[in-house]
């Protein structure tokens, strides 16, 4: 896949110094290559959240949608260039492909522009906890057993996102904050809630079986951090609806960052859900 070369403006040293440097940042489900990707918000997040290690936890590029219709605006190219520049500056970037960018799984063990490609990873926090890092689609029965249904669901989801963008354009004109229609609908549908619960419990159980204290995943576009059966389950959310990420502070504390809420509040200090050892 060829990307146009475009030089991003360098962040000022003053801006970089004013932001804390995190030990690790986890993001997933960017879905670059789709109109739903909130690339502008993501770029702003990356500028304010420098880190030692950055984990790209799957569905970074949406190969499913790009095969149907090419969509690659300059902002999406800027995100790729930003990631490559972070790698050049010494940030360790690990890419764990998901089902929408499963083509990258064939390149496990390779490095492109300083970005390592692995099908799963293990991250050890500063306080010694072992976190299993996976996208999570292997625990999705629809993906594994009825991929045609997954493609159908993807089309319906894309339609809901188009409606979501229209509604939020009206809300913006009225001075109202961003609101996710699809997230609201998922929260109201009992079957969707059962699916999420089953997914979370299955992922946590496998992490425990493998001897890890926690797991970081994506896939279901639902940011969460809670204990499940003695395992810390972390889902870093997505950059289509919620604009969320998981960060590790220098002392090993984990925090879910809700970037939309921070922007709405003027971005003064990190806020989110934290879990301490």
Regions found by a protein language model. Name each.
Residues 29, 58-59, 98, 135, ...:
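Active-site glycine-centered loops adjacent to acidic/histidine catalytic or metal-binding residues
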Residues 134-199:
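Active-site-proximal loop/helix segment associated with metal-binding centers of metalloenzymes
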Residues 113-120, 132, 137, 141-151, ...:
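Conserved beta-sheet core of the metallophosphoesterase superfamily
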Residues 24-26, 54-56, 132, 216:
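Residue-level marker for buried hydrophobic side chains located in beta-strands
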